[in-house]
Amino acid sequence: MATDDESFPWDQDSILSRDLLSALSPQLCYENLNRSCVRSPYSPGPRLILYAVFGFGAVLAVCGNLLVMTSILHFRQLHSPANFLVASLACADLLVGLTVMPFSMVRSVEGCWYFGDSYCKLHTSFDMSFCCSSLLHLCFISVDRYIAVSDPLIYPIRFTASVSGKCITFSWFLSIIYGFSLIYTGASEAGLKDLVSALSCVGGCQIPMNQSCVLINFLLFLVPTLVMMTVYSKIFLIAKQQAQNMEKMSKQTTRASDSYKDRVAKRERKAAKTLGIAVAAFLLSWLPYLIDSIIDAFLGFITPSYVYEILVWIVYYNSAMNPLIYAFFYPWFRNAIKLIVTGKILKQNSSTTNLFSE
C-alpha cells in the first residue's frame, strides 16, 4: 500500500494534467451539452468596453427615438403628415433598439446565443422587418420632401394625412410579411443544407442566406436607394433655383404673399436637407454590410466573424443616428426635449406650446 508521501506527487501531476487539458480544450456555450457551440470569449477588459459601446447604442436608439415619437405625437404643432412618417420611422428604429440590439449585444460579446432557437428566428425576423421598414419610410419621406420643395403651397393638398397613413401602412405591412416569411418558410436556407448542418449547434443563432435571398435583399435596398438619390438630386436643383430667385426678389419690393411663399420654401428646404442627411447616413451604414453579404454568398462565406460583427453593428447604430441628426438641425426638437426632460410636458395645455422660434 502506497504511503501519503508516495501518492502526493502522482496526485499533483494529475491535477496539473487536468488543468492543462482544461486550458487547451475549447470553451463551450453549454459545458454539459455535447452539441454545444464553441465560444471564443473576450478577455475582461475588451468585454467591458464592448458591452459599454453596444449597450450605449441600444439605450440611445430607444431613448432618442422615444423622444422623437413623444414630441411629434404630443405637441399639436408637429401634427403633420410628414411628421407622422418621421414618427413611424422612429418607431421602427426604437423597436430595433428594444428587440434586436440587446440580444445581439450578448451574442457579439459572449460568442453564444442564450435565448433559444425560437427567439433566434423571431430576432432575425424582427431585424429584417424593422430595418426594411426604416428604408421604405425614408424612401417615402424623400418623395414627401420633393413635393414640399417643388411646390410648397400646393403640398398640403397633395400629401394629406390619408396619403401619409397609406405610406406608413405599406411600409410596415410589406416589411413584416417579407421578413417573417423569409425566415419562417426556410426560403433563406434553401440549397444550403450542408452549411445549415454545420452551423447547427446549441448556443448558436446563425441563419445563412442563399444567393437568391441575398440578391433579393440587395434589390430591395437598391431600388429605394435609386429613388431617393434621384429625388434628392431634383430637390437640390430646385433648392438651388429657389435660392437664386429669392436673391433676385430680395432686391425688389415683394407682396406679402410672395414673402410668405419664400418663408415656406425656406422651411421646406431646411427640412429636406436634414432628412437628406438622415438618408445619407442610412445608406452609408447599410452599403458595406450588403456588399459583404453578396461577397459571402458567392464566395463561400469568407468574411471573418469580427469583420461581420463590425458591419452589423454599424447598421444597428444607424437606428440611433436619426434623433441625433434631428437634435442638431431642428430647433423644435431641442425645445421639445427640454419640455419632456424637465417634466413640463405634464402641465395642462402643454400640447399647444409653440416650439418654433420663427
Curated annotation (Swiss-Prot):
This is Trace amine-associated receptor 7h. It comes from the Eukaryota. It holds the Pfam family 7tm_1. Residues 1-47, 105-125, 188-217, 296-309 are extracellular. Belongs to the G-protein coupled receptor 1 family. It comes from Rattus norvegicus (Rat). The gene is Taar7h. Olfactory receptor specific for N,N-dimethylalkylamines trace amines. Trace amine compounds are enriched in animal body fluids and act on trace amine-associated receptors (TAARs) to elicit both intraspecific and interspecific innate behaviors. Ligand-binding causes a conformation change that triggers signaling via G(s)-class of G alpha proteins (GNAL or GNAS). In addition to the well known disulfide bond common to G-protein coupled receptor 1 family, trace amine-associated receptors (TAARs) contain an unique disulfide bond (Cys-37-Cys-201) connecting the N-terminus to the extracellular Loop 2 (ECL2), which is required for agonist-induced receptor activation. InterPro entries: GPCR_Rhodpsn, GPCR_Rhodpsn_7TM, TAAR, TAAR_fam. Keywords: Cell membrane, Disulfide bond, G-protein coupled receptor, Glycoprotein, Membrane, Receptor, Transducer, Transmembrane, Transmembrane helix. GO terms for biological process: G protein-coupled receptor signaling pathway. The chain crosses the membrane at residues 48-68, 84-104, 126-143, 167-187, 218-238, 275-295, 310-333. The keyword Transmembrane helix applies. GO terms for molecular function: trace-amine receptor activity. GO terms for cellular component: plasma membrane.
